[in-house]
A protein has these predicted regions:
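N-terminal small-residue-enriched
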Residues: 1-404, 408-412, 416-424, 428-435, ...
Length: 589
């Protein structure tokens, strides 16, 4: 296998990026940094099993941070000719000089720069066989996922049929090179292969339900064996015949596919800029316990081969694994170089690179046998005992369960942040959603691998066809367990994995949230209101889907009511947030 990629940044492009820094200095800049970003995406889309469209997009740009006379500006161009660049940078410097001076703007200290991101493949997110996959093979990967022909016709064996199916295969190569007048030289190269299926099913009464699933990998192995078409159908069918749940306070379990939605407002509130502007509900939280002792969040960008892994910040500083929240205590805010200088505090990360929420089960759920606890992570500067964990690791390997396997690039192109890692849509494919949170459902405890070979126990009724060929009638005994086998509680959740099914069993009864349907959180107060959908569960088992409901409350209060956090975040997502459970959440019809 060759160790080069056809569309990756070339030596000539690196040379022009380095030269452009000197051009900026020659034009009168006191300092300059440039990010060279390059991305290519190929998309093969099927509609109802037939080719709908084939698209290819490519992007290449230079983004400059220009400093001159104590002033600062950002400029971008896709012109790489030296004469054009020289003229562009002269005008850029002239423009910067028109701005108001800001003494806090400047490049990072040289001692803080990353020095080990040399070739771009250090984090193991690049597959050098990328160019060897043929057009026919890519199209076949899309066709293999389609199940429209199998389930589009009415059948006496089921009370539904697939009326629409959209399958999309895409592969993306993204490459970033960062260089500056202070000697920064950093590179990150990533490849991704992905296939997704979105289906709409119609029941016998004409009601329609939508389900979506996806599979992803740095190389195509996982895509080649993907069953996401069938899983998407499962997601849709499980929503048939929803009931109206009574309003009130419920134990809320949140699927790992959408749980990141609840942590994001907390991470946003930890921005030093938001704190400085008093637009954060965590203004005075640093160093204080403001959340449940069970909440432990780390930023872990140095986990090689994992989604979101990277060696350098967007300003060229070396990344570090960091404690963000430990035992409910806010340990760090996200502080850029600029805010560091403005506020006179040490810099940290400008934003979370790869947030990881650690496993936890409360004393309330364990019945006092073990007491609440969470699992520490060893290595990379962290000691499990230092995080207060009373266990070596959820899988007994001292690592707190590895929390994710696959690695990640988003749907595609770099979006000006110098990364190209899960930052939105691939070169105009219009998605702009992070994988895993695009799902309208997200059921099944171990859906990353064995997501419900049976449809599960929803209403105990007629829906009945099982993709895993299990009995063909009663819908199985549990939605989250695969093949309908009864699984008792594990004797010690700190030795084994903690999946959604375990948390449902521990919680007993409540509402499982599998999707957020709009809503927002007030960044200044933490008050939130979200539309949600999902399932009622009783005695640890799913009973029926529910119509959309509204949850309301306050983020600080919500995270103080944390009952459990699983060890099951979705591989391939940069935010490693597992299944979550909260007590006494207010639901309204």
């Amino acid at each position: 296998m060759k160790e080069s990629l056809d569309f990756a940044i070339s030596g000539a492009e690196i040379e022009i990026a380095d030269k452009s820094v000197q051009m900026a200095l020659d034009a009168g800049a006191s300092a300059a940094m440039v990010s060279l970003d390059k991305a290519k995406t190929e998309i093969y889309a099927l509609l109802d099993g037939e080719i709908d469209n084939i698209r290819q997009t490519g992007d290449r740009s230079l983004t400059f941070n220009i400093y001159a006379d104590g002033k600062y500006g950002t400029f971008s161009t896709n012109r790489f000719e030296e004469d054009s660049l020289r003229d562009f940078l002269c005008k850029a410097v002239e423009t910067v000089r028109m701005l108001v001076a800001d003494p806090f703007r400047g490049l990072p200290d040289k001692k803080d720069l990353a020095t080990d991101a040399v070739n771009g493949d250090e984090m193991g997110l690049c597959w050098y066989g990328y160019d060897s996959v043929s057009r026919d093979e890519k199209l076949e990967m899309a066709r293999r996922v389609s199940v429209f022909g199998e389930f589009s016709a009415p059948s006496s064996d089921r009370n539904w049929r697939v009326v629409s199916e959209e399958v999309e295969y895409n592969n993306t190569l993204s490459d970033t090179y960062l260089t500056s007048s202070d000697g920064c030289r950093c590179r990150q190269t990533e490849t991704s292969f992905e296939v997704s299926s979105q289906v709409t099913v119609e029941d016998n009464d004409g009601n329609k339900y939508t389900g979506l699933w996806w599979d992803y990998g740095v190389s195509p192995e996982k895509v080649l064996t993907s069953e996401c078409g069938r899983k998407a159908v499962e997601m849709a069918v499980m929503q048939i015949s929803p009931v109206n749940a009574d309003k009130g306070k419920y134990t809320m379990v949140v699927s790992r596919l959408v749980s990141g939605r609840l942590l994001q407002p907390v991470l946003n509130a930890l921005s030093s800029l938001s704190v400085y502007q008093k637009s954060s509900f965590l203004v005075d939280a640093l160093g204080k316990q403001v959340f449940s002792k069970g909440l432990n969040v780390m930023d872990m960008p140095l986990e090689k081969g994992k989604s979101g892994a990277i060696l350098f910040e967007t300003d060229g500083r070396a990344c570090r694994n960091r404690e963000i929240i430990t035992d409910g205590v806010v340990k760090e805010n996200f502080t850029s170089i600029y805010m560091s200088r403005k506020l006179g505090i040490p810099p940290t990360s400008s934003c979370p690179n790869r947030p990881v929420l650690q496993p936890f089960v409360s004393e309330e759920l364990l019945g006092g046998e073990r007491g609440g606890g969470h699992c520490g992570v060893n290595g990379d500067g962290f000691d499990g005992s230092g995080l207060g964990g009373d266990c070596g690791g959820v899988r007994g390997d001292g690592r707190g369960s590895e929390l994710g396997v696959a690695s990640g690039a988003g749907f595609g192109a770099a979006s000006g942040d110098g990364r190209g890692v899960e930052r939105g849509a691939a070169s105009g494919d219009g998605r702009g959603v992070e994988r895993g949170e695009m799902s309208g459902s997200g059921l099944g405890g171990d859906c990353g691998g064995d997501c419900g070979e049976v449809f599960g126990a929803v209403n105990g009724g007629e829906r009945g066809v099982e993709f895993g060929a299990v009995n063909g009638g009663e819908r199985g005994t549990e939605l989250a367990g695969g093949l309908g086998a009864e699984r008792g509680l594990k004797a010690d959740p700190f030795v084994n994995e903690i999946a959604q099914k375990d948390i449902l069993e521990l919680c007993g009864s409540g509402i499982l949230v599998t999707d957020f349907n709009g809503g927002n959180c007030n960044s200044a107060t933490g008050d939130f209101s979200y539309g949600v959908s999902g399932f009622l569960f009783e005695n640890g088992k799913i009973t029926s889907p529910i119509d959309s409901m509204l949850i309301t409350g306050n983020m600080t209060d919500l995270w103080n009511s944390l009952l459990a956090a699983g060890s099951d975040p979705v591989p391939g997502m940069s935010r490693q947030i597992p299944t979550l459970a909260f007590r006494d959440v207010t639901f309204n019809a």
